[in-house]
């Protein structure tokens, strides 16, 4: 089984990734993946796309047909366009409703998988030390602070370890980003000199 130390660290990595990538981006990606699965929703999505293309084609045909010179043809196209547009709007309304409920489900699962899990671990393991410190290694007040609020004295509590993990992950991500940006600008500088 995964130790408490690594469990808390991985939960914070997941939280950081969700916050960095963006919840709406993840929701949209999962929605697109869900539409690839053969379900009734994916059939509706394919039908919606077909109707959308048909509406655009009918609109194009109507614009290319003179309403005065070829009124019968134009009126027939107009009726077909209106009927197809109604079908498209009905299916679109159903898909929007299903996407809204899908998004709520994804948000709930995401919260329970990240922040909810973090809160659960902090509550459930509040008296459990993440790891012990060597005795006499730190002054009493520092050892007390590291074991705050309920871990045994001389150990690191899950709350403190959770804060350390969150801070370390954020700091390391900023360092990696800065290094990558510095390399990108260093690589772009010689290319800019060559063009001048």
UniProtKB/Swiss-Prot annotation:
The chain crosses the membrane at residues 5-24, 111-131, 156-172. GO terms for molecular function: protein-membrane adaptor activity. Residues 25-110, 173-196 are cytoplasmic. Keywords: Coiled coil, Endoplasmic reticulum, Membrane, Transmembrane, Transmembrane helix, Transport. GO terms for biological process: tail-anchored membrane protein insertion into ER membrane. Residues 42-99 form a coiled coil. Residues 1-4, 132-155 are lumenal. GO terms for cellular component: endoplasmic reticulum membrane; GET complex. It is a multi-pass membrane protein. It is found in: Endoplasmic reticulum membrane. Required for the post-translational delivery of tail-anchored (TA) proteins to the endoplasmic reticulum. Acts as a membrane receptor for soluble get3, which recognizes and selectively binds the transmembrane domain of TA proteins in the cytosol. Belongs to the WRB/GET1 family. Interacts with get3. This is Protein get1. It comes from Aspergillus niger (strain ATCC MYA-4892 / CBS 513.88 / FGSC A1513). The gene is get1.
